[in-house]
Design a protein with these regions (language model features):
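C-terminal charged interaction modules
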Residues: 112-169
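Eukaryotic low-complexity, non-globular regulatory regions
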Residues: 2-8, 45-46, 73-86, 154-169
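Proline-rich intrinsically disordered, low-complexity coils
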Residues: 3, 9, 28, 42, ...
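N-terminal secretory-pathway/extracellular module detecting exported/lumenal segments
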Residues: 1-41, 144-161
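Amphipathic, interaction-prone secondary-structure segments
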Residues: 21-69
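Generic preference for flexible, low-structure residues
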Residues: 21-24, 48-50, 80-85, 128, ...
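An exposed acidic His-Trp-rich patch
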Residues: 50, 57-130
Length: 169
């Protein structure tokens, strides 16, 4: 997983969702940024985002919650994940137990669930996912093409007249 903002710094800075919490029982007052991370494995089609919730009060470096969210149908994740996976867990949203959480994670998950009620926000996540995936796959295709070209050039050099050895008859 890689932050969207690393591949698209200007757009990521402009479009990262943030919320200011005031007088809530379940969260300290202040700003919460919902940083998007997407899969950077070539060819992956998981259609999911991982959200790291960060705060300026902790230098935007401490992760307050990690939330996984997929916007496709359960049937999509059932097919995508195969027999050993739980499509409900893959779809989410849910606190990602393999990544950092705090005692505020459940409250931040509830806040995220409120945010994704906005079709505009979900569409933004989907658009960012598409941009990110196209960028990853383009980069991968370029690296494969470069490797093929290097291999072909090596073959040509090895077959060239200076490298060819004549065998006595």
């Amino acid at each position: 997983m890689m932050p969207f903002i690393e591949r698209f710094p200007e757009l990521g800075a402009r479009e990262t969702r943030s919320v200011t919490a005031i007088h809530r029982q379940d969260l300290p007052d202040g700003e919460y940024g919902f940083l998007e991370l997407y899969c950077n494995e070539p060819g992956c089609d998981c259609r999911r985002v991982m959200i790291d919730v960060l705060r300026p009060e902790t230098g935007w470096s401490k992760i307050w919650a990690t939330i996984s969210y997929g916007w496709e149908s359960l049937d999509f994740y059932r097919k995508w994940g195969g027999t050993g996976s739980d499509p409900i867990e893959i779809k989410g949203p849910y606190p990602d137990s393999l990544n950092p959480q705090t005692k505020y994670s459940d409250a931040l998950l509830n806040l995220f669930c409120f945010l994704i009620q906005s079709p505009d926000y979900v569409e933004r996540l989907q658009r960012h996912y598409q941009m990110f995936r196209e960028s990853v796959d383009r980069e991968y295709d370029r690296s494969i093409t470069q490797e093929i070209n290097r291999t072909e050039n090596r073959r040509k050099r090895l077959r060239g007249p200076k490298r060819r050895h004549e065998h006595p008859r």
